[in-house]
């Protein structure tokens, strides 16, 4: 099996209509509800007099399966239908926001998350979803508003603390970011995601020895991921330790990709601190915003 040519991206294919309907069949069987003879996944209404329209719970299961499977168009349609049935429930609006954000419709996602918060002002998934959407639009100062409210209610939530750290890093407030990551590690010692983000923040501050000390035990562990190893390679590259960066790169990448990354690290070293921060954050902020909850 050949080596991978990259480690950051991960694509999830869309369901075909047939696969989506198969999921619906399974969910209906699990929920013990009557199944229409023909089901249109976009309208999710009974056809040919074969049964009553699905319930709110069934719609939420269908929409959730579509969202997980990457079938965002169906997820959006079904979450909207669920919101029509239970207009006071925040959950359909949160799911709708997640699906819209996944398609790049960030402004619509912001509206959806705010709709959820209008129904439950302390809903953590809605608060973090809204913060991630604001980060997507390059407005970390707005992201801090729902995150600060969430922190007051959940001060020991590691996922929330890491998202706060990412937001502070995007604002250029690296010391504050490191404080959040450090708090997160107190509640989740050895957490790889927190270690990666803390190490990157330390590197952005120019403290390469501390960054390496934080990340090296995680990246060199037997269970380490390619992302963790290549983040350590990036930090070595930023410090100018080309041999170490190349050695780590070759664990996961082919030679052409290693050479490409080494050239990129050299380019980063030649940038101003502000431009270097922007370049590094552009390849890490999306990961942080997408993957943390």
Language-model features, listed with the residues they occupy:
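Structural signature of tandem alpha-helical TPR/SEL1-like repeats
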Residues: 69-77, 102-115, 137-149, 171-183, ...
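Structural marker of alpha-solenoid helical repeat scaffolds
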Residues: 85, 119-120, 153, 187-188, ...
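Terminal, low-structured helical/coil segments at or just beyond the last alpha-helical repeat
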Residues: 37-42, 222, 228, 232-293
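Helix-start (N-cap) detector for alpha-helical repeat units in TPR-like alpha-solenoids
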Residues: 55-56, 90-91, 124-125, 140, ...
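Canonical tetratricopeptide repeat
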Residues: 95, 129, 163, 197-198, ...
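Alpha-helical segment of the N-proximal tetratricopeptide repeat
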Residues: 52-91, 95-102, 136
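Bacterial Sec signal peptide processing site at the extreme N-terminus
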Residues: 28-54
């Amino acid at each position: 099996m050949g080596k991978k040519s990259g480690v950051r991206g991960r694509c999830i294919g869309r369901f075909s209509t047939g696969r989506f309907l198969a999921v619906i069949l399974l969910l209906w069987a699990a929920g013990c509800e009557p199944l229409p003879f023909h089901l249109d996944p976009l309208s999710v209404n009974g056809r040919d007099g074969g049964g009553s329209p699905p319930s709110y719970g069934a719609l939420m299961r269908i929409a959730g399966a579509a969202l997980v499977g990457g079938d965002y168009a169906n997820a959006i349609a079904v979450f909207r239908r669920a919101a029509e049935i239970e207009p006071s429930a925040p959950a359909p609006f949160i799911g709708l926001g997640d699906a819209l954000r996944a398609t790049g419709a960030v402004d619509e996602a912001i509206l959806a998350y705010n709709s959820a918060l209008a129904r439950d002002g302390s809903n953590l998934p809605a608060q973090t979803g809204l913060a991630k959407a604001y980060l997507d639009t390059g407005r970390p100062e707005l992201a801090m508003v729902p995150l600060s409210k969430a922190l007051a209610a959940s001060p020991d939530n590691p996922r929330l603390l890491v998202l706060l750290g990412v937001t502070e890093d995007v604002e250029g407030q690296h010391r504050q970011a490191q404080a959040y990551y450090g708090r997160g590690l107190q509640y989740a010692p050895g957490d790889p995601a927190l270690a990666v983000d803390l190490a990157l923040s330390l590197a952005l501050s120019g403290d390469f020895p501390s960054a390496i000390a934080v990340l090296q035990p995680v990246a060199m562990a037997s269970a380490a991921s390619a992302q963790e190893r290549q983040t350590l390679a990036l930090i070595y590259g930023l410090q100018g330790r080309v041999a170490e960066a190349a050695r780590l790169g070759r664990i996961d990448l082919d030679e052409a990709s290693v050479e490409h990354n080494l050239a990129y690290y050299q380019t980063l070293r030649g940038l101003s601190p502000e431009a270097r921060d922007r370049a590094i954050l552009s390849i890490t902020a999306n990961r942080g915003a997408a993957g943390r909850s």
